Amino acid sequence: MSKIIVASANPAKISAVASAFSQAFPEQSFTVEGISVASEVRDQPLCADETLLGARNRVKNARKLQADADFYVGLEAGIDGGFTFAWMVIENHKQRGEARSASLPLPPIALEKIQQGIELGDVMDDMFNQQNVKQKGGAIAMLTNHTLSRSSVYQQALILALIPFMNEQWFPCR
């Protein structure tokens, strides 16, 4: 059984990781554990590079806390222009996979509040009169009338980040 450390305590992220690994490797068993670690970037990254750095830093910091895992997964959501998205970073002892999720357009009112320093999750809570949207379906669920969720969109990007692990013969070790 392989041990996966998710560099987040967010249930939506942990669920997405568990689903992605189960789909990518249906013949294997996994234990999935979420731990809180620093991203070392702003709470709301405001460009693609900062968002990717946050995901990489989460993996780096998770490895320091739990050196015995088989896989480490960092997910970091960010804003770039008028869109929100997330970077996925997956590492084991010899390989790294990275992928970016689909981009979701944000309403102008949300972007204005984000520019004032308010996190997207808090903006969504306010706009939709909800609590803790970011740990449930996220902005994605709210803006798609629950057609998609944060977890479902992240799951697809995680499977893409797993490509080097699913096709080791085509991806030299880093």
From Swiss-Prot:
Q: Does the keyword Hydrolase feature in the UniProt annotation?
A: yes
The cofactor remark states: Binds 1 divalent metal cation per subunit; can use either Mg(2+) or Mn(2+).
Which reaction does this chain catalyze? Answer: XTP + H2O = XDP + phosphate + H(+); ITP + H2O = IDP + phosphate + H(+)
Q: Which domain of life is it from?
A: Bacteria
Task: Name the enzyme group at the top EC level.
Answer: hydrolase
Q: Residues that bind Mg(2+), according to the entry? A: D68
UniProt-recorded Gene Ontology molecular function terms: ITPase activity; metal ion binding; nucleotide binding; ribonucleoside triphosphate phosphatase activity
Which parts of the sequence bind substrate? Answer: D68, A69
Concerning its family, UniProt says: Belongs to the YjjX NTPase family.
Record note on quaternary structure: Homodimer.
The protein's role, per its UniProt record: Phosphatase that hydrolyzes non-canonical purine nucleotides such as XTP and ITP to their respective diphosphate derivatives. Probably excludes non-canonical purines from DNA/RNA precursor pool, thus preventing their incorporation into DNA/RNA and avoiding chromosomal lesions.
The name of this protein is Inosine/xanthosine triphosphatase
> In the record, what lineage is assigned to the organism producing the protein?
Bacteria, Pseudomonadati, Pseudomonadota, Gammaproteobacteria, Vibrionales
